[in-house]
Amino acid sequence: MASKASSLGSVSTGNFTPAPPKKGALSGTKEFLESNSIVAKIAFLLLVLIAFIIILRLGIQIISYFMAPSSSPTVLSGMTDANHMHIIPQNPALPHSIPILRSINQQDGIEFTWGVWTFIKNLKPENRYKHVFHKGNNKVDNDLGMNFPNNAPGLYIAPHTNNFVIVMNTFDKIKEEIIVEDIPLNKWICVIIRVENHNLDVYINGVIVKRHVLASVPKQNYGDVYVSMNGGYNGYTSTLKYWNTALDVSQIQRFVNAGPDLAMKEKDMTQSEPRYFSLRWFFQNPEMDYGGL
C-alpha cells in the first residue's frame, strides 16, 4: 500500500518558499531614503530645510505679534496734574518704558500723529514757555522754558498769552514753530499734531485749525518723552497717545469722541467741567491758517 502511486501523480515534499509580500508606499519610501543616490539625499535635505524655514518664519511672526511694541501706544494714561513732571523712557530694557516706533514711510513720505488732552486752569504772567510735552533730549532752558534742540514734536504755551506753540525739528531747520492762538481756559481741549510728508496739521477738538508746510523732511529722534517739564502749567494733562501713521478724519474724530481719561487718584471737580468749548471760537479766530484747504 505504501508503494502505490497516486493516480494524480506524485507530490513533491520539498521545502515550500512563500512568495514575498508586495512592497507598498512605506517600503518604497524606505528604499528611497536608504538608497545611495546623492540626488535622493539632497532632495530630502531640501525638504527638511524648507519645512524648517516655514516653521521658523511662522514662529517669529507669532512672537513678534505678542512681544513687539504697539504701533499706537498710549504714552500717558489717565489724568495728571500738569505741574508734575513725567518721563517716559524709550529704552526697552528699562522698567515702565513705552517705546515709540518711528514712522513707516508710506507712499507720501514720513507720517505720524500725536494726540493729547489739556485742561488749562489759568495762566500766570511769565516770561517763559510753559511745557506740555515733547519728545527729545532733556535740556530745557529754565529762562526760556523750551527744550533745545530736539522737539519731535514739542507742545508749549507761549509766554504772556494763551497760545499753543508746536515745535518740530526738520533736517534743514532745527526748529519750526506753529502757533495756535487764543486757546480757551477751563475747558478740556484735544490737540492733534498730524505729520504727513512735509505737511504738519494741527487739530483742535477734531477741527483742523492750522496747516504748516515744513521746510524739509521731519526729523524724528530716539529721545524720551517728557511731560510737564520745568513746572509745566496750571491745569491737567490726559491721554497722551502716539500713532506711527497719519490718522484720517474718522480716526481723529474717534479719539476726540472718546474724550480725556479722567481717572485720577485724588478727586477733582474738573470731571464736572464742560468738555468742549463753543464753536464760536473756530469762526471768530481770524488767525486761523488752513494752508489753502
Regions found by a protein language model. Give the residues of each.
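Extracellular glycan-associated modules
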Residues: M1-L293
